[in-house]
Regions:
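Short beta-strand/turn micro-motifs at beta-sheet edges
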Residues: 9-13, 73-74
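Amphipathic alpha-helical dimerization/coiled-coil segments
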Residues: 2-5, 90-117
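Basic amphipathic alpha-helical segments that dock to polyanions
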Residues: 56-63
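A positively charged, amphipathic N-terminal helix/segment that binds anionic biomolecules
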Residues: 1-9, 85
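Amphipathic alpha-helical recognition patches that constitute DNA-binding helices
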Residues: 18, 22, 82, 86, ...
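N-terminal helix-turn-helix DNA-binding core of bacterial DNA-binding proteins
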Residues: 11-55
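Beta-hairpin "wing" of winged helix-turn-helix
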Residues: 64-80, 86
Length: 117
C-alpha cells in the first residue's frame, strides 16, 4: 500500500476507456516509451493508478492501430531500444472528446453523491 494508506487502483478497476484516455493525456507531455507511461501515471496519481504491462502494451497497440498514437523506435535513457509514442492529430481530437465525456460523467457522479446524503 502506498504512503497515506490509499489502495492502488488496478486497470481492471477503471471504467472502460479510461486507460486509453489517460495514456493519450500522458503522451501529450512529449514522446515517451511504455515503461515511462506506466511510471508517469503512477507518479502523477501519487501511486493510486498502477498499470501492469499486460494492460498497458495492448492498449498502446490499440491506440496506435486506431491512429491516435504514432510510434518510433529510439534509445531509452538506459541505452536500450524502446518504442516511443507521441500523440497524433487524430489522437488530439480523440483526447478532447474523451476529456469532455469524462468531465460530464464526473460532474454527473458528483451531483448524485452530493444529493444522495
Amino acid at each position: 500500500m502506498p504512503p497515506g494508506g490509499v489502495t492502488p487502483i488496478e486497470k481492471s478497476d477503471l471504467l472502460p476507456g479510461t486507460l486509453d484516455m489517460l495514456i493519450l493525456k500522458i503522451v501529450t507531455l512529449g514522446p515517451i516509451h511504455g515503461y515511462g507511461i506506466s511510471q508517469r501515471l503512477r507518479q502523477i496519481s501519487k501511486d493510486v493508478l498502477l498499470v501492469q504491462q499486460g494492460s498497458l502494451y495492448p492498449a498502446l497497440h490499440r491506440l496506435e492501430k486506431r491512429g491516435w498514437l504514432a510510434a518510433e523506435w529510439g534509445e531509452s535513457e538506459n541505452g536500450r531500444q524502446a518504442k516511443f509514442y507521441k500523440l497524433s492529430a487524430k489522437g488530439k481530437q480523440q483526447l478532447r472528446k474523451e476529456e469532455s465525456n469524462w468531465n460530464r460523467l464526473a460532474g454527473a457522479v458528483a451531483n448524485i453523491l452530493q444529493t444522495a446524503e
